[in-house]
Amino acid sequence: MRIIAGKYKRRKLFTPKGIQTRPSTDRLRETLMAILEGGRFGFPLNSNLIIDVFAGTGALGIEAASRGHPNKVIFIEKNSNAVKIIEENIKITKSNELFEILNIDLSQITTWKFEKAGLVFLDPPYFSDLVEKALIKLKEIDAILPDAIIVAEVSIREKNKFIKNFRILFSKKLGKS
């Protein structure tokens, strides 16, 4: 797995051994970034703050930072082994000051000490019902801008849930996602 484009292009990302995480494939990230860079939804890769929840390897947040110009990317990941992988992947960017890792379950965050995010990636374990819970929590702690773009990766067998104050702008099937 590698960074596909931008200032960190071709840098190899570390991935965990075993199946505790399900890293987003290069194909999925490339398609997703093309959609986000296309202008149809503004230019969310240039948001001041990008949040990558259920961050796993950090690939989505790092790819977004590679292509855009955020002031900060925050990874939220409760698994300590995954956090170690994210730390290694941040080191390869040589831009440590751009990234921050919160080693905590999103549901445990009670206050948000950062500015509001314009782009959020949600990539929870499949069939966990965590997308809806994460959206509610992010809104509750006031972590997202009213017009933030939320990108959620779910299994094609999971139903899209329409959540109050959120609407689906775009949906695309890629492999099993």
PLM regions with names:
Residues 1-177:
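Class I S-adenosyl-L-methionine-dependent methyltransferase catalytic core
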